Swiss-Prot record:
Homodimer. Residues 278-303 are annotated as: Disordered. It is found in: Cytoplasm. NCBIfam families: DapF. It is an enzyme of class 5 (isomerase). Gene3D superfamilies: Diaminopimelate Epimerase, Chain A, domain 1. Pfam families: DAP_epimerase. GO terms for cellular component: cytosol. This is Diaminopimelate epimerase.
């Protein structure tokens, strides 16, 4: 019988994350285990960040990302910050290189506790997102929420940050829209063969964006780091903002910079909640006082 694995329940601006220590193990977290953990109010999460031994030379760890519906995700910026905080507390290191399904990324914990993640380069070609049909210009595609003569949401910008995003621009408060109603319909629209993350964005100044996101495989979320990046690069690409913006998500602000080398940097906090152990096959778990960060962090607040 396999031994249980350690985990830490954390959050990145309210994006609920489980950081699971799968190093030195041959097994992986099953979909059934993820769904069981997601259904428990104490361990409910948006994503699991499972830390595995490295698969590629030059990287520190491979991170498998699992949504709360048991599906695999390519990227999770908020979850990556949580992984960095957990590993920094354990190892004393502050810079890491990870491999995910979306590729290689680097991340650094700063002296003030904030964490920057290099989210890589955005992609805009319709094949790379991917879309189901050719689109000449992904800055604005034909997609809308009915009624046809006065659509509630329409003409989103499309981008990939290693995962597909649609950003709908609105001219009023993002809370004015029923994202819980429109989100699942748009996520599963036929134009997105791999489904998509759906965001509503309101540009409030040349360097500030308000954002709400329906996250693919997770639903409404208080924060989605890759969506914040997709909104920031799409805003710059369409002339709505400059290349360095604050994106205000329901959980708080993220600083996003689309650098001249085309890389997108995301900076924000992470917060430790509690630790425990769990069975990666079944999802059976228990809380303990020792975990990825040890017993001395039980009252640790936001970094």
């Amino acid at each position: 019988m396999a031994t249980k694995a350690a985990f830490a329940r954390m959050n990145g601006l309210g994006n609920q994350i489980i950081v699971a220590d799968m190093r030195g193990r041959a097994d992986s977290i099953t979909s059934a285990a993820a769904i069981r953990l997601a259904s428990d109010s104490e361990t409910a999460f948006d994503q699991i960040m499972a830390i595995h031994d490295p698969r590629t030379p030059g990287t520190d760890y491979y991170i498998a990302i699992i949504n709360c519906d048991g599906t695999q995700a390519q990227a999770c910026g908020n979850g990556t910050r949580c992984v960095v905080q957990a590993l920094a507390a354990e190892t004393g290191r502050h810079a890491f290189t990870f491999e995910t399904r979306a590729g290689i990324l680097t991340a650094t914990e700063h002296d003030d506790g904030l964490i920057s993640v290099d989210m890589g380069t955005p992609r805009f070609d319709w094949q790379d997102i991917p879309l189901a049909q050719a689109v000449a210009d992904t800055r604005k595609i034909e997609l809308q929420v009915d009624p046809a003569d006065a659509p509630v949401l329409h003409s989103p910008s499309i981008a990939s940050m290693g995962n597909p995003h649609a950003v709908f621009w609105v001219d009023k408060d993002v809370w004015s829209y029923e994202l819980d109603k429109f989100g699942p319909l748009l996520e599963n629209h036929p134009i997105f063969p791999e489904r998509a993350n759906i965001s509503i964005a309101h540009v409030t100044s040349s360097d500030t964006i308000d954002l709400r996101t329906w996250e693919r495989g997770a639903g409404l979320t208080r924060a989605c780091g890759s969506a914040a990046c997709a909104a920031a690069v799409s805003a710059a690409r369409t002339g709505r903002t400059g290349r360095k913006v604050t994106v205000n998500v329901p959980g708080g602000p993220l600083l996003i910079e689309w650098r001249d080398d085309d890389h997108v940097m995301m900076t924000g906090p992470a917060e430790w909640e509690f630790s425990g152990t769990f069975d990666p096959a079944t999802g059976e778990w228990s809380r303990d006082t020792q975990g990825l960060q040890g017993s001395g962090n039980a009252d640790r607040g936001a970094a």
